[in-house]
């Protein structure tokens, strides 16, 4: 048994040795793997080191494509980029969209792309519109609906095709492009009417209204596109802006500013009078013979707002033989009756031209045609402008515009020229004599105690007056008066526009300007306050008579010839002290002493008691029993209208008010005038 075991051992060892000869061990496999790896590494090119300064730098793209932007990878300027070409996305490679700033949130994405210039606007719809021989425009309905969704979709409504089928020559209406609002209308009206008279005679006037089943208006939806720079003739390439949207906004502001003060002339209407129907823009209507483009505002079609009924269907004032045709019924008869009143507030006109910011008169506001005859002048002017005969009739669809003939009947505003101020002032104002008159009035009206209080207040600012006026000569004083009159010229418009009682005084307290509301509240007429009529007021607020005439304050007051007129009925401006009661006058001059040479922007808000204007007859009437019953009725019923305001304080002659006033200085830093407004009665 042992011999067999030992004999089999070499055999097993020999078998194992055979296996080792055929199969390599683990060490041999590791060496072979290292050899193959080193061989592959030696054959492959070395990768560029990111920190190597000599490596070629890739050019930074101005804007990455959408795919590279999503993947946060470096892109190139070429389209399609190399990365999209490798991935097979060259057909979908386009510029990515950056996050817009807040002030550009409403801008279209394409408008913010740099370098697009004026090529962003898509003129595909405009270029694909063939013009027929009769001047109308034919558009594919499908194309219109698809392109219209990009802008402002407007509700569909009936289109009114008023045009002629007779072909027009090309040189009759030369223009830059079908959508450009600038049209060269240099033909005279006589020549234009002669060239179109044959077509008008050959074809009878007809107005066709197409329903929903008929072809819709091709310019209903996308006709008004504010992103088109050609619409306002903007040259965006000449504007130094980084993006197109900013240049378009700047150009629009400039376009609005240049036409803000223009009148609705023919040139103004030619710049922006593209109407609702495209067929009427390139031809002359056979009903009137009047051109549909670039003529007077009365003949204009609605402005660039497509078929919007709220903006285009406003009926306008027409001749009595012209009937209104309210298309969409925006103004029913029940809702328009209040607008036909002559005292209705004037609204800004939506004129055909973009430069009209005028307010039309009440006769040009939307109203119902009453059918009665207007003046013959109005009929002649309308017929002349529209080309109609005396008995011609036609339905009219227009927008409210400022007719030329309506300027003759509207409220005329007087022309004011500030140059008259400098021409009229030849002498300096006599402030010294006016202060003497004020001193005499204070001594005559107030008690010695209150006169002393007012004198102390004026004495506190007397050194400042002397210091500021000692170097002024005659020319300076004349210039000072011109400054006062020029400032007062500006305040007149402010007083007329302000709805609260307002007065303007000189530094002496003399009334220089007054508003209508102040006269209604106090009963003081404007001419009396300004010294144009005699002052017959006897109401002093129940102030006590002055003391003995031998007071020390009257000894040094100069007596000049001007004081002789300081009697009831004197023709000179009223002092502010005559409009207030005793306590209010003392309080005013104490505040004036603090504010005259103090804060130049300061103001005073306090209460006072205004004195009503009362003659001797008014004082007797105030004591009657009838007036007592009227005051009781007024106290129960309240205040209604101007009559109620006039009755405020009619019994005791005082109206308690809250008011605000300030001091305005001239170029020499001297108090020039006192502006007092917001006299609100305490009811």
From Swiss-Prot:
Biased composition (Polar residues): 151-218, 264-287, 314-325, 376-408, 537-565
Region (Disordered): 1-58, 131-224, 261-328, 351-418, 537-569
Pfam family, one: PAS_13
Gene Ontology BP, a term: cellular response to starvation
Subcellular location as annotated: Nucleus
Keyword Transcription carried by entry: yes
Gene Ontology CC, one term: nucleus
SUPFAM superfamilies: Zn2/Cys6 DNA-binding domain
Record's compositionally biased regions (Low complexity): 134-150, 352-366
CDD domains in the record: GAL4 (cd00067)
Primary location group: nucleus
Positions of the DNA-binding region: 65-93
One GO MF term attached to the UniProt entry: zinc ion binding
Keywords assigned by UniProt, alphabetized: Activator, DNA-binding, Gluconeogenesis, Metal-binding, Nucleus, Transcription, Transcription regulation, Zinc
Domain of life: Eukaryota
Keyword Lipid metabolism annotated: no
Record-linked InterPro entries: ERT1_acuK_gluconeogen_tf (IPR050335), PAS_13 (IPR056751), Zn2-C6_fun-type_DNA-bd_sf (IPR036864), Zn2Cys6_DnaBD (IPR001138)
UniProt family annotation: Belongs to the ERT1/acuK family.
Function: Transcription factor which regulates nonfermentable carbon utilization. Activator of gluconeogenetic genes.
Stated name of the protein: Transcription activator of gluconeogenesis acuK
Species the sequence originates in: Aspergillus fumigatus (strain CBS 144.89 / FGSC A1163 / CEA10)
């Amino acid at each position: 048994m042992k011999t067999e075991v030992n004999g089999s051992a070499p055999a097993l060892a020999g078998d194992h040795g055979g296996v080792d000869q055929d199969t390599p061990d683990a060490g041999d496999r590791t060496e072979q793997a290292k050899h193959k790896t080193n061989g592959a590494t030696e054959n492959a090119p070395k990768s560029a080191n990111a920190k190597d300064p000599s490596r070629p730098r890739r050019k930074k793209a101005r804007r990455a494509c959408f795919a590279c932007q999503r993947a946060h990878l470096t892109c190139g300027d070429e389209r399609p980029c190399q990365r999209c070409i490798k991935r097979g996305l060259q057909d979908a490679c386009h510029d990515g969209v950056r996050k817009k700033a807040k002030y550009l949130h409403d801008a279209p994405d394409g408008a913010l792309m740099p370098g697009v210039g004026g090529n962003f606007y898509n003129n595909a719809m405009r270029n694909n519109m063939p013009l027929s021989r009769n001047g109308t425009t034919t558009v594919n309905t499908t194309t219109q609906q698809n392109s219209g969704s990009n802008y402002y979709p407007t509700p569909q409504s009936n289109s009114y095709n008023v045009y002629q089928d007779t072909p027009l020559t090309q040189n009759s209406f030369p223009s830059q492009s079908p959508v450009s609002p600038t049209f060269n209308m240099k033909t005279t009206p006589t020549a234009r009417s002669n060239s179109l008279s044959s077509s008008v005679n050959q074809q009878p006037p007809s107005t066709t209204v197409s329903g929903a089943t008929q072809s819709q208006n091709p310019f209903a939806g996308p006709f008004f596109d504010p992103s088109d720079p050609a619409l306002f003739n903007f040259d965006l390439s000449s504007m130094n802006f980084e993006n197109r949207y900013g240049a378009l906004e700047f150009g629009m502001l400039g376009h609005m500013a240049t036409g803000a003060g223009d009148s609705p002339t023919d040139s103004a209407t030619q710049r922006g009078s593209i109407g609702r129907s495209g067929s009427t823009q390139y031809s002359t209507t056979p009903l009137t013979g009047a051109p549909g483009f670039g003529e007077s505002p009365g003949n204009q079609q609605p402005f660039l707002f497509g078929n919007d009924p709220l903006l285009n269907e406003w009926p306008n004032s027409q001749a009595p033989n012209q009937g209104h045709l309210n298309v969409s019924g925006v103004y029913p008869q029940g809702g328009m009756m209040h607008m036909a009143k002559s005292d209705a507030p004037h609204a800004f006109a939506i004129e055909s031209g973009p430069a009209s910011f005028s307010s039309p008169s009440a006769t040009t506001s939307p109203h119902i045609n009453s059918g009665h005859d207007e003046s013959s002048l109005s009929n002649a002017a309308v017929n002349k402008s529209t080309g109609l005969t005396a008995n011609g009739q036609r339905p009219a669809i227009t927008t409210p515009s400022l007719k030329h003939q309506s300027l003759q009947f509207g409220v005329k505003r007087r022309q004011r020229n500030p140059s008259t101020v400098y021409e009229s002032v030849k002498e300096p104002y006599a402030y010294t004599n006016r202060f003497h008159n004020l001193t005499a009035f204070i001594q005559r009206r107030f008690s010695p105690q209150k006169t002393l209080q007012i004198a102390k207040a004026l004495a506190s600012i007397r050194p400042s007056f002397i210091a500021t006026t000692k170097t002024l000569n005659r020319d300076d004083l004349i210039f000072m008066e011109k400054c006062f009159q020029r400032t007062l010229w500006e305040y007149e418009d402010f007083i007329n526009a302000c709805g609260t009682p307002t007065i303007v005084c000189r530094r002496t307290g003399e009334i220089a300007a007054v508003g209508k509301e102040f006269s209604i509240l106090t009963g003081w007429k404007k001419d009396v306050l300004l010294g144009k009529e005699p002052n017959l007021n006897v109401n002093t607020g129940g102030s006590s008579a002055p003391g003995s005439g031998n007071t020390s304050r009257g000894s040094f007051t100069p007596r000049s010839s001007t004081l002789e007129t300081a009697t009831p009925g004197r023709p000179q401006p009223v002092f502010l002290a005559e409009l207030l009661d005793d306590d209010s006058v003392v309080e005013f001059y104490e505040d004036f002493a603090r504010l005259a040479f103090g804060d130049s922007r300061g103001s005073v808000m306090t209460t006072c008691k205004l004195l009503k204007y009362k003659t001797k007859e008014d004082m007797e009437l105030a004591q009657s029993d009838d007036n007592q019953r009227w005051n009781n009725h007024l106290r129960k019923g309240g205040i209604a209208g101007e009559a109620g305001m006039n009755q405020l304080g009619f019994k005791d002659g005082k109206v308690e008010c809250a008011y605000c006033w300030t001091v305005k200085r001239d170029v020499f830093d001297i108090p020039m005038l006192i502006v007092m407004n917001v006299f609100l009665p305490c009811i």
